[in-house]
Regions:
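Conserved glycosyltransferase catalytic-site signature
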Residues: 15, 108, 138, 181-186, ...
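Active-site metal-coordination segments of metallo-dependent hydrolases
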Residues: 73, 130-139, 181, 293-298, ...
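Short acidic/histidine-rich active-site segments
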Residues: 197-207, 211-213
Length: 419
């Protein structure tokens, strides 16, 4: 946003990048959605002298080579040491800090580690949804906080919050990510700031490094060579023209050398999904409130250890993050390390379904989507929002983002006014 305000970039969106955003929820590589503006890649350093780039260096995020054998007991002992060291380092601050507690494996592990590292009561925040529902784990998060002697503030995101805050949240994410988790993350950032917190610890990175996603388990299946790679079709399938997957294809080509199939899938996620969706979401939704998000699972020592683990200690037997779960079962039994978790996404599908016709009409005529998708497909996505939320949310977020950053629409009104 600063570059655009200074006149150093064009207030336009590259059509190929819009297609990528709709299909993947994020954009890949160095080129941003704004023509002429590029990202520094993770671990990259540029040396600029007299207005020109004279040197470029990049530190590899992940180690080379395949998994390294290690026994379960030795792995658990090593994991405990590297996690505790990382959390202790991430707690170094001269300002108040806290934790975003979702009730899942990752934030529960951080809760236990923060208590050990600091020896003091942890301040945690969690968020639930109006009406609750099976995807609301905020009460479970509050229970875990009590079990660990932590102070926990529970927020509630209502349907009205969705309609009024979504334009402001889209305006805060200059590098766009159509991940519905931007909504609760923004609310948590606002609550942290209003409560005097300047730093929060967050669980991003654990799934990518310890093998948490179901797509990783598929990479270990005997029939994996017969299946399509992750993100093969995109959110809208063949309705969007070819070319949107070029960035992922390039990452796949670079990720697999000398690695297991599971590691290759992890490496692609660490190269694209993690920095361009999850960490972008975290940075923009927190820093707009002046709050710093810290990610202990992404400590280089933790990342090196986790990525080299044998595949069987990451994914298998119906579960991911097996070693992390085994560690949590011993360190924090109340967390239910092998219980099924429900995720951290608000019921945007049900909320959009309440005004599906209005949203479909407004989105179908929006300049952000013109020529990218047929209008009939846009309307169909909103008509089906309650059953399948992501397509409709991707369309809505993209239109809101385009309005704020390209058209200059003020984000102060509700969704209907912003569109």
């Amino acid at each position: 946003q600063a570059l655009l305000a200074a006149g150093l970039g064009e207030r336009a969106a590259a059509r190929q990048r819009l297609a990528e955003l709709l299909q993947l929820k994020f954009t890949t590589g160095a080129a941003t959605i704004f023509p002429g503006i590029c990202r520094l890649l993770p671990g990259e350093t540029l040396l600029v002298e007299r207005g020109a780039i004279t040197a470029r260096r990049r530190r590899a995020a992940l180690p080379e080579g395949g998994p390294v054998p290690i026994g379960r007991d030795a792995a658990l002992q090593r994991l405990d040491a590297v996690l505790l060291d990382s959390v202790a380092a991430h707690l170094r601050a001269d300002v108040p800090y806290g934790l975003f507690l979702s009730g899942g494996i990752d934030s529960s592990a951080l809760l236990a580690l923060m208590r050990r590292a600091s020896g003091s009561r942890v301040r945690a925040l969690t968020v639930g949804w109006d009406g609750g529902g099976e995807a609301d784990e905020s009460f479970e998060a509050a229970r875990l906080a009590r079990a660990m002697g932590a102070e926990c503030e529970r927020l509630t995101m209502t349907e009205q919050d969705f309609w009024t805050l979504a334009p402001r949240i889209a305006a805060a994410t200059d590098d766009p990510t159509a991940d519905a988790a931007v909504l609760p993350s923004w609310m948590l950032g606002r609550a942290a700031a209003s409560g005097g917190l300047k730093v929060t610890l967050c669980g991003e990175g654990a799934d990518e490094l310890f093998g948490g996603y179901s797509r990783y388990r598929k990479r270990r299946a005997p029939w994996r060579w017969l299946t399509r790679p992750p993100r093969a079709r995109g959110i809208f399938g063949g309705a969007i023209a070819d070319g949107w997957r070029d960035g992922i294809t390039a990452a796949e080509a670079a990720a697999g050398q000398g690695r297991s199939a599971l590691q290759a899938a992890q490496a692609v996620d660490c190269a694209e999904w993690l920095p361009n969706d999850l960490l972008t979401k975290l940075d923009r939704t927190l820093m707009v409130h002046g709050v710093e998000g810290r990610t202990p699972f992404l400590d280089p020592v933790v990342a090196d250890f986790a990525f080299r683990l044998p595949d069987a200690r990451k994914a298998g037997a119906g579960f991911g993050k097996r070693l992390l779960r085994d560690w949590l079962a011993g360190a924090f039994p109340e967390a239910g390390a092998y219980a099924r978790k429900k995720g951290f996404k608000p019921p945007v599908g049900a909320w959009m379904a309440q005004r599906a016709d209005m949203l479909g009409d407004l989105a179908a005529g929006h300049p952000a989507l013109a020529g990218v998708l047929p209008t009939a497909r846009i309307r169909a996505a909103f008509a089906d929002a309650e059953r399948s939320a992501q397509p409709a949310w991707s369309l809505l977020f993209t239109a809101l983002w385009y309005g704020a950053h390209v058209l200059g629409v003020p984000p102060d009104g509700d969704i209907g006014e912003a569109l």
